[in-house]
Amino acid sequence: MSSDPMRNIRNFSIIAHVDHGKSTLADRIIQLCGGLEAREMEAQVLDSNPIERERGITIKAQSVSLLYKAQDGQNYHLNLIDTPGHVDFSYEVSRSLAACEGALLVVDASQGVEAQSVANCYTAVEQGLEVVPILNKIDLPTADTERAKAEIEAVIGIDASEAVAVSAKTGLYVEQVLEAIVQRIPAPQPRDTEKLQALIIDSWFDNYLGVVSLVRVMQGEITPGAKLLVMSTGRSHPVDAVGVFTPKRKTLAKLTAGEVGWVTASIKDVHGAPVGDTLTLANDPAPKPLPGFQEVQPRVFAGLFPVDAEDYPDLREALEKLRLNDAALRFEPENSEAMGFGFRCGFLGMLHMEIVQERLEREYDLNLITTAPTVIYEVLKTDGTLVAMDNPAKMPPINQINEIREPIIRSNILTPPEYVGAVITLCEEKRGSQIGITYLGNQVQVAYELPMAEVVLDFFDKLKSVTRGYASLDYHFLRFQEGPFVRVDTLINGDRVDALSVIVHRHQAERRGRELCEKMKDLIPRQMFDVAIQAAIGSQIISRSTVKAMRKNVLAKCYGGDISRKKKLLEKQKEGKKRMKQIGRVEIPQEAFLAVLQIDNK
């Protein structure tokens, strides 16, 4: 390499909407640079988690260091940091981008620009990254590179005249991408301080090594034996080993400025290396941490309970291990009258929640019940205190509430023009208020303010169905807004089931209560006694349905004879049912808890 060790380093990310071929392009780049031999290559090398492969999405940021001999004859050190594309994982993207000097914006030439690419691209531009547009899937008959270029310029506003057109699947023109990386993405710049500063891009737990952190060294160097200080926690740890992924784990003597690699430092506590934090030397610390570290705020909350109460300690341990990989996952113990001990968990969105539940069940072999997800509400009490409420069961009594505020988000929806009407209708049904509509070439951008509670459940699915799958959605939190909200409780035989309580808009309360009762009637198995299902607001019952009892025909052995004999047997049966109803408990199946989700918010 040249005299300046950082001159030939290129740190870059790949940003794209879900399904535009980001992971496939990463595979081709690894193959071309000889990161893996042909026999070791497999599809989606960087998506190491089986759920990522099955769903075809990237959840966690991954990195790989490659050597590339460019056409100018020099050897370049390329560090690729893969990023997720789904709206739920936008913080993962911003951290990955903070570790780079450039980004490849991958756009499917047959589909054009979609909302998530726009959001991630704006993040990259705000952080001062050089964005190189890549048009992928040019081998498809429906690919239209000129239209895709025009959309990139119209929607995102960056110059696409030198966009590189490739087919990641076949490997066509991928070498031009590598040349564009070398020529257009700047080398890392030395910082004004000589002291060590390293950004933690990701952390995960390894049973043998403890916590492994993926870091970008901004300044200084990390060597085994040095004492590292984690700036947000104030704790220091001795470094065991450092290295890079090629994508196999490779140990090095040191990590120097500009490089991206892994560090192990015997950190056993899963909260010891928060993602987005800064590492520095304990005996010669940097004056201030790197900018941009923020605590991620969960937006969707749900209860997770083990089906078997004995699994509670295992669930706690599994959640603690998952939280290390997942900076956004929050949980606290919760006790439900209906389901015993479990945890109240906070997630970024519905996809995040599904993935966490799937990982718990798969990787830790747990059998779980999930309650219906809710968003966080603000409650202003009559004594002037403001409380955050993430669980409807914790809502204060009505006479203590001054007002309830719900979270409002701003959503940007990109859709083909023919579906604009359907999108507007859907947003209006969800109590949205329109901000504006912008026509951008072959796409229309519809901006709405929507209540988050309406979006988290099934908005995305409905948006896809009314636009035949063409629309894409990106959203961010705006503010809390007051509204007329009530809690609808579900009573089973007069007992309130706290896990089935929901907070709804007053105008929808009666319909939601009625639909919930009907749904529960189909899902609760018949007992030996009548089961009354009621929906109530406070003490006022707004709906009721009954699961009829199974009964034995006690008159089967009476042939003719006196009517009083039959009456006596029927009375005896009635008494037994009454007694049974007093002591009998109704087992509520998992499907009943998810019924709250399935009620169509028409």
UniProtKB/Swiss-Prot annotation:
Gene: lepA
GO terms classed as biological process: positive regulation of translation
Enzyme class: hydrolase
Principal cellular location given in the protein's record: membrane
Gene Ontology CC annotations of this record: plasma membrane
Function: Required for accurate and efficient protein synthesis under certain stress conditions. May act as a fidelity factor of the translation reaction, by catalyzing a one-codon backward translocation of tRNAs on improperly translocated ribosomes. Back-translocation proceeds from a post-translocation (POST) complex to a pre-translocation (PRE) complex, thus giving elongation factor G a second chance to translocate the tRNAs correctly. Binds to ribosomes in a GTP-dependent manner.
Organism per entry: Xylella fastidiosa (strain 9a5c)
GO MF annotation: an example: translation elongation factor activity
Annotated InterPro entries: EF-4 (IPR006297), EFG_III/V (IPR035647), EFG_V-like (IPR000640), EFTu-like_2 (IPR004161), G_TR_CS (IPR031157), LepA_C_sf (IPR038363), LepA_CTD (IPR013842), LepA_IV (IPR035654)
Residues the entry annotates as binding GTP: 19-24, 136-139
Catalyzed chemical reaction(s): GTP + H2O = GDP + phosphate + H(+)
Keywords from the named record: Cell inner membrane, Cell membrane, GTP-binding, Hydrolase, Membrane, Nucleotide-binding, Protein biosynthesis
Compartment(s) of residence: Cell inner membrane
PANTHER family in the record: TRANSLATION FACTOR GUF1 HOMOLOG, CHLOROPLASTIC, TRANSLATION FACTOR GUF1-RELATED
Stated family: Belongs to the TRAFAC class translation factor GTPase superfamily. Classic translation factor GTPase family. LepA subfamily.
Name of the protein in its database record: Elongation factor 4
Domain tr-type G positions: 7-189
Gene3D superfamilies tied to this protein: 3.30.70.240, Elongation factor 4, C-terminal domain, Elongation Factor G (Translational Gtpase), domain 3, P-loop containing nucleotide triphosphate hydrolases, Translation factors
Keyword Membrane recorded: yes
Membrane-topology annotation of the record: Peripheral membrane protein
E.C. number(s) listed in UniProt: 3.6.5.n1
